[in-house]
Amino acid sequence: MSTGTVVQVIGAVVDVEFPHDAVPQVYDALEIKSEGLVLEVQQQLGGGVVRTIAMGSSDGLRRGLEVVNSGSPITVPVGEKTLGRIMNVLGQPVDEAGPIGEEDRYVIHREAPSYEDQSNTTELLETGIKVIDLVCPFAKGGKVGLFGGAGVGKTVNMMELINNIAKAHSGLSVFAGVGERTREGNDFYYEMEDSGVLDKVAMVYGQMNEPPGNRLRVALTGLTMAEKFRDEGKDVLFFVDNIYRYTLAGTEVSALLGRMPSAVGYQPTLAEEMGVLQERITSTKTGSITSVQAVYVPADDLTDPSPATTFAHLDATVVLSRNIASLGIYPAVDPLDSTSRQLDPQVVGQEHYDVANGVQTVLQRYKELKDIIAILGMDELSDEDKTTVFRARKIEKYLSQPFFVAEVFTGSPGKYVSLKDTIRGFKGILDGEFDHLPEQAFYMVGSIDEAVEKANKK
């Protein structure tokens, strides 16, 4: 437990001088007791001076303050006691419900499981959301990314997934709010409370008003808690909203530390930082971590280095499209852009694969015909193409679905559609069983039976 003194403060960057024989290691946690502030060592500058990043506000810091070295990286509470609680990056409770009372603490910087410890699974995880279950099915213990620009529904989709999976799966969940709005964190808490699954969720928040060091580490805090449950042999759901803010915090820290920026101003260590986090989110022979990550796409550009780096780590990608949202189709998932490694006849079965493929083929053909329709009109199309267009429009409408978490806004009750019903519905549309129904009957319904019922009412 060596002590040092603050020698320089520039925003969130604090330089601390220690005796030459007691210099802290990189990633060690230091504490300024008088301010209750934790610093994390990032660089050793030589001459006994270390450069640190503050985990909280550095307002009011001054040179000469005493700093104590804890001798280890940041540790956070893990285990059963974290469930139903909201914590910050340091694992301190922020829900005014008293101390956590944890029995164990883990350091947030840990090694990823070794190659031989990892397990491979192809078991499907049903979400109850038609478009996801059909074209980009999730695997239990897999990694899923929800990609989308601002305001296309990443958080609402994630809330619905939590609502559907946490209820049906009845396992444990860890939610890491990385650089998102405080209001969303608040909404999430009450949503979980109303659903009665609060006692199965641990929440870790580092909102967008927090300093960059805090936002950079909060994902690791949440992941550490999820790893503990996994190592106890449980199946955990790990939600991150939003992984882009993690990258952004890394960019800010990198700039503060004076590193030369790389493409588009991102940190030169972008791929490595993303890898450090993503490699730890994995399933072992003891338990599984199924992770769902929201990924903000700057200016709707999927080739931006941040989303492009994230793509490489995922098993399934759910791409949300502004064009689809503008048609009033929610969830605004693009069935042609979204992908999944699970969409393989050997995993999902031949029927599911053929139906998903058929849906994508029809929608792709419709996309190609749109230009012809815009110039020459529908009358110039062959009968076969006309049928394709009518079916594609029905499929587009049928891909929409009322959500449980959006009942307040839409006024229509949420619907959970089983995979069997999803395949049956789309197969019927492709086979022409519902050619006689008006396309509006397919909009915002659950199963295909509801669409038929809606059409008959009219």
From Swiss-Prot:
PROSITE patterns: ATPASE_ALPHA_BETA. It catalyses: ATP + H2O + 4 H(+)(in) = ADP + phosphate + 5 H(+)(out). One of its GO terms (cellular component) is proton-transporting ATP synthase complex. It is found in: Cell inner membrane. It holds the Pfam family ATP-synt_VA_C. InterPro entries: AAA+_ATPase, ATP-synt_VA_C, ATP_synth_F1_bsu, ATPase_a/bsu_AS, ATPase_alpha/beta_chains, ATPase_F1/V1/A1_a/bsu_N, ATPase_F1/V1/A1_a/bsu_N_sf, ATPase_F1/V1/A1_a/bsu_nucl-bd. SMART domains: AAA (SM00382). ATP binds at residues 148-155. It is an enzyme of class 7 (translocase). CDD domains: ATP-synt_F1_beta_C, ATP-synt_F1_beta_N, F1-ATPase_beta_CD. It is a peripheral membrane protein. Its EC number is 7.1.2.2. SUPFAM superfamilies: C-terminal domain of alpha and beta subunits of F1 ATP synthase (SSF47917), N-terminal domain of alpha and beta subunits of F1 ATP synthase (SSF50615), P-loop containing nucleoside triphosphate hydrolases (SSF52540). F-type ATPases have 2 components, CF(1) - the catalytic core - and CF(0) - the membrane proton channel. CF(1) has five subunits: alpha(3), beta(3), gamma(1), delta(1), epsilon(1). CF(0) has three main subunits: a(1), b(2) and c(9-12). The alpha and beta chains form an alternating ring which encloses part of the gamma chain. CF(1) is attached to CF(0) by a central stalk formed by the gamma and epsilon chains, while a peripheral stalk is formed by the delta and b chains. NCBIfam families: atpD. Belongs to the ATPase alpha/beta chains family. This is ATP synthase subunit beta. It comes from Shewanella piezotolerans (strain WP3 / JCM 13877).
